[in-house]
């Protein structure tokens, strides 16, 4: 009897979440109808929960697969304006395609599906997305944020949103991806957005590259450095410029196949270490690059940046 009731509850949830590509959510051991509408994390809200359309100017979740979202969301955002501001910071991560369920996971929190009870992501969904995306975030100097710690989410035998696409069989042998820091923008706007997300921008020569603990270390030549954006760099940083490419020992970076000539590098200073965020071969004939360097300080930096900011709780 209990198993049958549990199966019925699972079927009801699967129907309600049908817009999420028809993927099952497991509810065999959870009394869905017994859920209480308690304040999230002990916080009380000035307004009762409401459902509204996911707007087009919430691009993180507008194409997630369902039309209506619940407010307050599962990150304690009470207004749509707050959701938009915080969610926009995660668009760069979504664009990196570090896991096929990144959008489903993030939108289950930022724009939860409109039901009369909050439905959390399963812990396994969080862990799968974290395994795919945390190394990429670490490469840019951003730890997996506290608000997304997977122990906060229910186990898969509870009523929750399970992995949607992560179990699909591979249709082709895996291809080694280019290092994240070596993915290039080809427009001036793209370059300037990268500059917005970086603490410093330097034109430099690279003397040598070393492999150390799974990272690459780019050691700059003593001379012929030009600081285009100094940010937090101090004299000791620029005297012997050493840039760390996190988690990049085993991935290709075509720009660094030859160290001849100069490079345009962008990075962040994290815990005293200079992390490389982007690298380009310097090309004085490249009009887009010349334009970006000339006008980077007058460019209206997007709210998406610095890269992955908004991963912390709002202040």
UniProtKB/Swiss-Prot annotation:
Q: Which residues form the FZ domain?
A: 46-163
- The disulfide bridges present are 51-114, 61-107, 98-133, 122-160, 126-150, 179-251, 182-253, 196-301
Which residue intervals define the domain NTR in the entry? 179-301
Segments spanning the bilayer are none
Keywords assigned: Developmental protein, Differentiation, Disulfide bond, Secreted, Signal, Wnt signaling pathway
Which organs or tissues contain this protein? Answer: Strongly expressed in the retinal pigment epithelium (RPE). Weak expression in retina, brain, heart, liver, kidney, testis and muscle.
Instruction: Give the residues annotated as coiled coil.
Output: none
What GO biological process, any one, is recorded here? non-canonical Wnt signaling pathway
Q: Name where it's found.
A: Secreted
Xref: SMART domains: C345C (SM00643), FRI (SM00063)
Q: Does the keyword Nucleotide-binding apply?
A: no
Q: Which domain of life is it from?
A: Eukaryota
Q: Which GO terms describe its molecular function?
A: Wnt-protein binding
Quote the record's domain comment. The FZ domain is involved in binding with Wnt ligands.
Question: What is the role of the protein in this entry?
Answer: Soluble frizzled-related proteins (sFRPS) function as modulators of Wnt signaling through direct interaction with Wnts. They have a role in regulating cell growth and differentiation in specific cell types. SFRP5 may be involved in determining the polarity of photoreceptor, and perhaps other, cells in the retina. Inhibits Wnt8 signaling, in vitro.
Q: Which family does it belong to?
A: Belongs to the secreted frizzled-related protein (sFRP) family.
Q: Which PANTHER family match?
A: FRIZZLED, SECRETED FRIZZLED-RELATED PROTEIN 5
Name of the protein in its database record:
Secreted frizzled-related protein 5
* Species name: Bos taurus (Bovine)
């Amino acid at each position: 009897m209990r198993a049958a009731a549990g199966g019925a509850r699972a079927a009801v949830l699967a129907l309600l979440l049908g817009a999420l590509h028809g993927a099952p959510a497991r509810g065999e051991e959870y009394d869905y109808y017994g859920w209480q509408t308690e304040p999230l994390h002990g916080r009380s809200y000035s307004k009762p929960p409401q459902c509204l359309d996911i707007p087009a100017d919430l691009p993180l979740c507008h194409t997630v697969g369902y039309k209506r979202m619940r407010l307050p969301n599962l990150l304690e955002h009470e207004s749509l304006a707050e959701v938009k501001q915080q969610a926009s910071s995660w668009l760069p991560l979504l664009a990196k395609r570090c896991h096929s369920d990144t959008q489903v996971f993030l939108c289950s929190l930022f724009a939860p599906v409109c039901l009369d009870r909050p439905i959390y992501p399963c812990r396994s969904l969080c862990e799968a997305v974290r395994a795919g995306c945390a190394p990429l975030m670490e490469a840019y100097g951003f730890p997996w944020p506290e608000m997304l710690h997977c122990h906060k989410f229910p186990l898969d035998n509870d009523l929750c949103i399970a992995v949607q696409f992560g179990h699909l069989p591979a249709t082709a042998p895996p291809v080694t991806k280019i290092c994240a820091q070596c993915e290039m923008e080809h427009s001036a706007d793209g370059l300037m957005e990268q500059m917005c997300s970086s603490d410093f921008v330097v034109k430099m020569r690279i003397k040598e590259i070393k492999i150390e603990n799974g990272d690459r270390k780019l050691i700059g030549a003593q001379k012929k450095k030009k600081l285009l954006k100094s940010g937090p760099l101090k004299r000791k940083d620029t005297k012997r410029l050493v840039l760390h490419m996190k988690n990049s020992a085993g991935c290709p970076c075509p720009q660094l196949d030859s160290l001849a000539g100069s490079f345009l590098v962008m990075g962040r200073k994290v815990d005293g270490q200079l992390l490389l965020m982007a690298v380009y071969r310097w090309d004085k004939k490249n009009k887009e690059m010349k334009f970006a360097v000339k006008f980077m300080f007058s460019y209206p930096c997007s709210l998406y940046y610095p890269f992955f900011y908004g991963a912390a709780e709002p202040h």
